[in-house]
């Protein structure tokens, strides 16, 4: 019994996992029994089972003192000692696999980031090209917007781009049902524009914009870029249309032999082309309106009312100061005009030709007419004839 108890006590005493003091004092050739329970290799096993990163030198330089105060270096650590070859090999293999997984994840992350960077750079380049194209088109639009509104829409029937049925090659293609194909449409529009020989200020930016848009459509397969290019192509077509209209108008103006400065507003053909024979005398001399080619109203002593009406509407069509000063209460207007007209036309029939051939107003007879009408000069003493010189001395109200 005692022998059995001794044997059991010895087994208990020799077991390092049950009695710390016995295992610490008893040494044997067995490395498991000679190592205390709180030995650093156990802590190393626990840390190795939890770690996913490889061990660093700082673990051994900063944490040299472990549970029981025994210090180890990296070379003396039992984790790397050949006493546990299977455990060390397993830990090393697991750490290598973990490192391989981490390296694979890092490489995948870096490759994704690099692809994102490359795609972002390409997108920025395409957007920059589109922005440059927009700027060029805006310059052309600003140059064309300086023209008056009479240029735009004045010759809608002269261009094939106003209606889609007028030109078969400009019909929308099957690739895009909403907008015309930018390649064929812009090339056709540019060829059409060159036939009119427009100004280089308009032609050069349009050519550059069309070439850039065609290049972007060919080199950028993205749907967003394609849609942007098609929108820019439609804008370019509109600008080409306005340039063609302006070129047609400039050719028509040159064919009419009008001395106009280039890119100036056209003349109003309804009022200014045929208005040179009807130039007013008041425009040059500051006097009441009197048409040079209109004959002076016929005066007859038997029809004073008719002559009074004609002269009044011709000479004093506007409400000027002459109208209020001549029509005084002392002299009736009918007698005044009849006396003045009688004075002018009684002297000589050639007087009418002389007075109409000159650019002076009928209120101031020429010296020739005065010499011809010398026998009738005493008639100027009448009140009707004295009212005419008073016009120059009367101050303006």
UniProtKB/Swiss-Prot annotation:
Residues 22-37, 269-281, 352-369, 382-397 have a biased composition (Polar residues). Signal peptide: none annotated. GO terms for biological process: interphase microtubule organizing center assembly; microtubule bundle formation; mitotic cytokinesis; nuclear migration. GO terms for cellular component: cell division site; cytoplasm; cytoplasmic microtubule; cytosol; equatorial microtubule organizing center; interphase microtubule organizing center; microtubule cytoskeleton; mitotic spindle pole body. Keywords: Cytoplasm, Cytoskeleton, Phosphoprotein. The modification Phosphoserine is found at residues 366, 396. Its main location: cytoplasm. It is found in: Cytoplasm; Cytoplasm, Cytoskeleton, Microtubule organizing center; Cytoplasm, Cytoskeleton, Microtubule organizing center, Spindle pole body. Residues 1-13 have a biased composition (Basic and acidic residues). Residues 1-44, 269-298, 346-397 are annotated as: Disordered. Disruption phenotype: Abolishes cytoplasmic microtubule nucleation from non-SPB (spindle pole body) sites, but does not appear to affect the formation of astral microtubules. Fewer and thicker microtubule bundles, with microtubules curving around the cell tip. Cytokinetic actin ring displaced from medial region. Curved cell shape. Interacts with mto1; the interaction is direct and required for efficient binding to the gamma-tubulin complex. Interacts with gamma tubulin complex subunits alp4, alp6 and gtb1. Acts together with mto1 to promote nucleation of at least a subset of cytoplasmic microtubules, by recruiting the gamma-tubulin complex to the interphase microtubule organizing center (iMTOC) and to the equatorial MTOC (eMTOC) during anaphase. Does not appear to be required for cytoplasmic astral microtubule nucleation from the spindle pole body (SPB). Required to establish the eMTOC, and thereby to tether the cytokinetic actin ring. This is Gamma tubulin complex adapter mto2. It comes from Schizosaccharomyces pombe (strain 972 / ATCC 24843).
């Amino acid at each position: 019994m005692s022998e059995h108890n001794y044997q059991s006590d010895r087994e208990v005493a020799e077991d390092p996992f049950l009695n710390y003091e016995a295992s610490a004092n008893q040494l044997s050739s067995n490395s498991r029994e000679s190592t205390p329970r709180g030995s650093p290799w156990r802590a190393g096993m626990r840390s190795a089972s939890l770690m996913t990163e490889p061990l660093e030198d700082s673990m051994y330089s900063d944490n040299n003192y472990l549970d029981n105060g025994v210090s180890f270096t990296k070379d003396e650590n039992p984790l790397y000692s050949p006493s546990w070859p299977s455990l060390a090999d397993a830990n090393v293999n697991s750490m290598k696999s973990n490192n391989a997984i981490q390296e694979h994840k890092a490489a995948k992350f870096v490759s994704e980031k690099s692809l994102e960077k490359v795609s972002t750079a390409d997108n920025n380049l395409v957007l920059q090209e589109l922005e440059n194209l927009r700027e060029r088109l805006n310059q052309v639009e600003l140059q064309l917007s300086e023209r008056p509104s009479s240029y735009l829409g004045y010759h809608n029937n002269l261009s094939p781009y106003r209606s889609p049925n007028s030109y078969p090659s400009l019909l929308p293609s099957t690739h895009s049902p909403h907008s015309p194909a930018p390649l064929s449409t812009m090339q056709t529009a540019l060829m059409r524009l060159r036939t009119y020989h427009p100004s280089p200020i308009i032609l050069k930016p349009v050519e550059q914009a069309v070439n850039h848009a065609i290049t972007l459509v060919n080199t950028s397969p993205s749907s967003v870029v394609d849609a942007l290019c098609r929108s820019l192509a439609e804008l370019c077509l509109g600008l080409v249309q306005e340039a063609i209209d302006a070129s047609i108008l400039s050719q028509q103006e040159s064919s009419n032999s009008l001395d106009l400065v280039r890119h100036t507003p056209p003349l109003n053909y309804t009022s200014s082309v045929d208005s040179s024979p009807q130039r007013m005398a008041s425009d040059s001399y500051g006097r009441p309106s009197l048409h040079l080619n209109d004959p002076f109203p016929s005066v007859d002593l038997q029809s004073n009312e008719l002559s009074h009406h004609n002269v009044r509407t011709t000479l004093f069509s506007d409400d000027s100061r002459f109208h209020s000063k001549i029509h005084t209460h002392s002299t009736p207007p009918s007698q005044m005009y009849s006396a003045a007209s009688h004075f002018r036309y009684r002297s000589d029939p050639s007087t009418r030709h002389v007075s109409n051939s000159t650019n002076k107003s009928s209120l101031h007879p020429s010296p020739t007419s005065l010499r011809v009408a010398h026998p009738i000069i005493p008639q100027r003493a009448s009140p009707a004839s004295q009212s005419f010189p008073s016009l120059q001395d009367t101050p303006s109200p």
